[in-house]
């Protein structure tokens, strides 16, 4: 019940779902048995957040019948690695290891780019889903290497037609209706605008595509481009490590 209902408080109320399946809960239990102590509530909720499908992509990276290594390792990471090996110019300096990917812009600068989707959050709360999407990738450029400067945002929205009245529901018996298409469109667009432009990062590029198939869930891509000097104080800027005593 802890996976569905969350941690129980002293007054017997629950904090809300952790979204952890039985296998994940057993893994957490076995680890803390091994180190001979109980987990704190913060540790449990941290694991629930970082192991979520939204953050960890357990389904996307999981093994499937005819692709044992999973879709991500075979078709994204694997394909990228093959292409890079064939090229003579080794311009990719950081891939699949940091908060964003980084390539050489010229001999003095690196450019980094991070794009992520915020589909389900935007279906439930269009403004909140898209603003957390864009500021999240702003953060990822800031977190690249020793800290890149975000210089531009990008977006791609795949939405249902805003002038149509779709009758869709999340639950059986016409319970929990989907938000109206025009409400989703306005909220998604406003979220990226406020998250980027109002913090001083321009949004010069984007695309919008409309189709009935996105009435159940919009596709909301948010992206940020950043710049960072090739070297900082004589050291490669994409190289970093955490040291004891560092501030967070």
Protein language model regions, located:
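Core nucleic-acid recognition elements
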Residues: 1-248
């Amino acid at each position: 019940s802890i996976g569905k209902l969350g941690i129980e408080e002293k007054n017997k109320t629950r904090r809300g779902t952790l979204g952890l399946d039985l296998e994940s809960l057993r893994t957490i239990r076995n680890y803390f048995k091994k180190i001979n102590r109980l987990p704190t509530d913060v540790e449990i909720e941290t694991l629930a957040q970082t192991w979520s499908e939204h953050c960890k992509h357990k389904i996307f990276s999981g093994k499937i019948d005819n692709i044992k290594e999973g879709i991500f390792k075979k078709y994204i990471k694997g394909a990228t690695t093959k292409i890079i090996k064939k090229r003579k110019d080794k311009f990719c300096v950081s891939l699949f290891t940091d908060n964003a990917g980084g390539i050489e812009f010229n001999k003095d600068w690196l450019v980094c780019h991070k794009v992520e989707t915020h589909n389900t959050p935007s279906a439930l709360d269009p403004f909140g889903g898209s603003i957390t999407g864009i500021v999240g990738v702003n953060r990822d450029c800031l977190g690249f290497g020793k800290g890149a400067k975000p210089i531009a945002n990008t977006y791609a929205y795949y939405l249902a037609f805003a002038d149509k009245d779709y009758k869709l529901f999340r639950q059986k018996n016409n319970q929990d209706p989907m938000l109206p298409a025009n409400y989703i469109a306005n909220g998604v667009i406003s979220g990226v605008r406020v998250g980027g432009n109002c913090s001083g990062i321009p949004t010069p590029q984007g695309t919008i595509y409309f189709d009935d198939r996105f009435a159940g869930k919009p596709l909301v891509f948010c992206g940020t481009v950043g710049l960072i000097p090739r070297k900082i104080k004589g050291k490669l800027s994409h190289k970093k490590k955490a040291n004891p005593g560092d501030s967070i």
